[in-house]
């Protein structure tokens, strides 16, 4: 968890849940009230943070001017990325895919609350049980994403 941080860059990290089956499933990345930062080049598998109601492998709450780009978020437990009350955030060129059979990821990307002026583009998404992207009208501009479960004709 990072809270009230600004002007940061997190790059080139690997996060993999390797705990035993009885250990609490709580790993993930959570940014709260952060601004002017980047998360790039993350390689992750089986991030377990979140519940069906709230949270994701990568969760941003009340953040602005954050870029998440060129990350692989594979087999997240509930969802890949969630933004809550975020402004001017960019999710670009990420692979958010549940490869399990059967999958458990509800959504790849979800925006909730007072999100506005965000950009979701050129992401590769697949394996969502519900929908690949869930957001309210006006929460983000969405373009150029590839939904592997529903490819364009």
Please give the residue ranges for each predicted region:
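Leucine-rich solenoid repeat scaffolds
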Residues: 105-153
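Surface-exposed loop/turn segments connecting beta-strands in extracellular beta-rich domains
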Residues: 5-8, 17-19, 34-37, 45-48, ...
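Short, Lys/Arg-rich amphipathic segments at extreme N-termini
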Residues: 1, 13, 30, 92-94, ...
């Amino acid at each position: 968890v990072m809270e009230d941080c600004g002007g940061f860059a997190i790059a080139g990290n690997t996060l993999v849940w390797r705990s035993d089956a009885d250990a609490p499933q709580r790993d993930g990345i959570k940014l709260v009230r952060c601004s002017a930062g980047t998360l790039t080049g993350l390689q992750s598998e089986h991030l377990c943070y979140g519940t069906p109601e709230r949270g994701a492998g990568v969760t941003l709450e009340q953040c602005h001017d954050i870029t998440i780009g060129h990350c692989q978020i594979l087999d997240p437990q509930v969802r890949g990325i969630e933004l809550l009350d975020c402004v001017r955030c960019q999710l670009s060129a990420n692979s958010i895919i549940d490869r399990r059979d059967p999958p458990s990821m509800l959504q790849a990307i979800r925006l909730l609350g007072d999100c506005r002026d965000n950009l979701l583009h050129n992401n590769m998404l697949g394996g969502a049980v519900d929908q690949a992207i869930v957001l309210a009208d006006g929460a983000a501009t969405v373009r150029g994403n590839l939904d592997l479960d529903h490819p364009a004709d």
